[in-house]
Amino acid sequence: MKKETTLSVLIYIFGPVVRFIIVEELVAAAMDFAWNSCLQDMILRSAGSAHSLRIQTMWAFLRLLLSAGAGCLSVRKEALLEKDAFVTAQKQRRLLHKGYAAFGENFKARTMSLLLSAVILLALAINVLFSCIMPDLGSPQSFGNLPGIAGILLQAMLYCFFMPYVEETVFRGILYPRLQRGYGTRTAILGSAAFFGIYHGTLSQGIYALIMGLVFAAAYEAAGSFKVPFALHGACNLAVLLLQWTDTYKTFCKPLWAAVFTGTAVCGFFMINLIIKKTAE
């Protein structure tokens, strides 16, 4: 009986995440089959070899958009319920803990600015460290590239808005509060970050996602608002995209810059901690 109860709890916690991944993979597989079986030859033949790279990149973007979107829609009901329940619970907790006010109703612009800056610098530091120490693994974040203003806008919408929303909905919006209710806040932060890392697949992306997942989950816990991890996630992707667009990524791929980014990020997190403690007094 105990095993059945444990199994039902695990299904309740991880069921939506598994469903999201299954739907996402099925849609992606269907699009791959359609592309490889008939669409690739037909489209590339009519467009010409000069546009083949752009068309293949566009198809990759469309594949990501449709597969992730379908996966997100499959867990939409759970996401809405969990977000509302989590926000309500956090508001009740703030009545008992003044420290949460710094990230709640009395959230200051300077606190958000510090948090945003610190998280972006941490994201850049991890990317730079991987590029310096383990170049064979590649950058933790690597985005497809489309030329022109239209390509830039498409990338910005996909990687700075759409994908952060989808991933935060699944891993912070659903998985985190369910883990928290079952196993506590620390386990929820670690568990949601771990599954976020596993979801990203490769070693470099997995480690990067694990570290950033810890930050996003902690920010969600402290702020009690889905907007905060969503904004942080989008801002981190935008920072890496800006380096890619301006072709300055290689300039910063040096240990010195990694140390500068990391040190500044740590200072930012330290100042945020001081703000919370001061508010709690």
Predicted regions and their residues:
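Hydrophobic alpha-helical transmembrane segments
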Residues: 10, 14, 110-117, 153, ...
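Alpha-helical transmembrane segments
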Residues: 7-24, 67, 113-123, 191
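Small-polar-interrupted transmembrane alpha-helices in polytopic inner-membrane proteins
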Residues: 185-200, 234
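Membrane-interface capping segments at transmembrane-helix boundaries
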Residues: 76-84, 270-281
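Juxtamembrane helix-loop-helix connectors linking adjacent transmembrane helices
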Residues: 31, 35-54, 83-163, 176-177, ...
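Membrane-interface helix/loop boundary segments of multi-pass membrane proteins
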Residues: 166-191, 218-225
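Alpha-helical transmembrane segments in multi-pass membrane proteins
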Residues: 16-88, 114, 259
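Functionally important transmembrane alpha-helices
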Residues: 21-33, 193, 205-261
